[in-house]
Swiss-Prot record:
Source organism (scientific name): Shigella flexneri
Taxonomic lineage of the native organism: Bacteria, Pseudomonadati, Pseudomonadota, Gammaproteobacteria, Enterobacterales
Superkingdom, taxonomy of origin: Bacteria
Family, per entry: Belongs to the bacterial ribosomal protein bL20 family.
Protein name listed in UniProt: Large ribosomal subunit protein bL20
Any one GO cellular component localisation term in the record: ribonucleoprotein complex
Keyword Ribonucleoprotein attached: yes
Function: Binds directly to 23S ribosomal RNA and is necessary for the in vitro assembly process of the 50S ribosomal subunit. It is not involved in the protein synthesizing functions of that subunit.
Entry's Gene Ontology molecular function annotations: rRNA binding; structural constituent of ribosome
Length: 118
């Protein structure tokens, strides 16, 4: 059986990993074995955090809506319930944007929600 020389493939694989680890601190960017572990872990963090980002943004939007709603004398849960009853279909992302940048429009939404609850 012919001898298989794998130097070229190994070099390419190492180069690929070290390229991915570029910018990492110390041995993590220079030593293949350490860099490989760092790249694998970074991938795990990235995978996890792509999912967490969606949750975190929703939390942020809810916190902003709640703060603005309470300034207008209504709690977040009652505000959302009022909007549902008034059949206002604005998602939390847009509501949070309105709460931050257009206080007058948000106040009118609060009034609609209060009217629907009454």
């Amino acid at each position: 059986m012919a001898r298989v020389k794998r130097g070229v493939i190994a070099r390419a694989r190492h180069k690929k990993i070290l390229k991915q680890a570029k910018g990492y601190y110390g041995a993590r960017s220079r030593v293949y074995r350490v860099a490989f572990q760092a790249v694998i872990k970074a991938g795990q963090y990235a995978y996890r955090d792509r999912r967490q980002r969606k949750r975190q943004f929703r939390q942020l939007w809810i916190a902003r809506i709640n703060a603005a709603a309470r300034q207008n004398g209504i709690s977040y849960s009652k505000f959302i319930n009022g909007l549902k009853k008034a059949s206002v279909e604005i998602d939390r992302k847009i509501l949070a944007d309105i709460a931050v940048f257009d206080k007058v429009a948000f106040t009118t939404l609060v009034e609609k929600a209060k009217a629907a609850l009454a």
